[in-house]
Amino acid sequence: MVDAKILNGVSTLLRAYGRLTCGVLAEKMNMLPSSMVYFLRDAVDAGVLTECNGFYDVPRPRPTPPVRRNATEQPAVDDAVWCNWRRSLPWVEGNTIPALAKEFATGVLTCESVHIVAEVDNRMCEQGMPRFVMAYIDIRLGRFICSSSVWNITDHVLRYLILDCSPAPAAVQEVA
């Protein structure tokens, strides 16, 4: 059973601030986190709230897909063959290098690098660099290097996406 008064307060906070954690909701509602977590679990089970990676939100309708103008020229997205052996990774904020990045390192030992797509700040854009650039992380030095200009862009990286450059499994290569 979900308490309607608490649900109303939580829903109002989520609409105002967007996704929030249990701790933040408990603080704003002046509740103990231990009490809030039980309420949130019940609300998620009842379908009145959603939870993803510890963040709670009110259910929102999915945006309708845009109208495709040249539908006859391009195959439908549902017909696409999705790659199920490449790892899908989230964007990493800033220029910190998580331990996960070392799993994607390639090259000779002590000269390893990780290929990325990096978003750079306005200062680099003013110098003629595009907003998103192919780059690599020199694991040994902890530096971000632009692949096209070979500039050290470490201090200018806003966020980056690690690229999985591992070889395709043998079964996939035989089909291609």
Swiss-Prot record:
Induction behaviour: Expressed in the early phase of the viral replicative cycle. Expression of early genes is repressed by viral Repc (latency) and favored by viral Ner protein.
Keywords: Early protein, Host cytoplasm
Cellular component annotations (GO), alphabetically ordered: host cell cytoplasm
Cellular localization per UniProt: Host cytoplasm
Protein name: Uncharacterized protein gp11
Organism: Escherichia phage Mu
Organismal lineage: Viruses, Duplodnaviria, Heunggongvirae, Uroviricota, Caudoviricetes
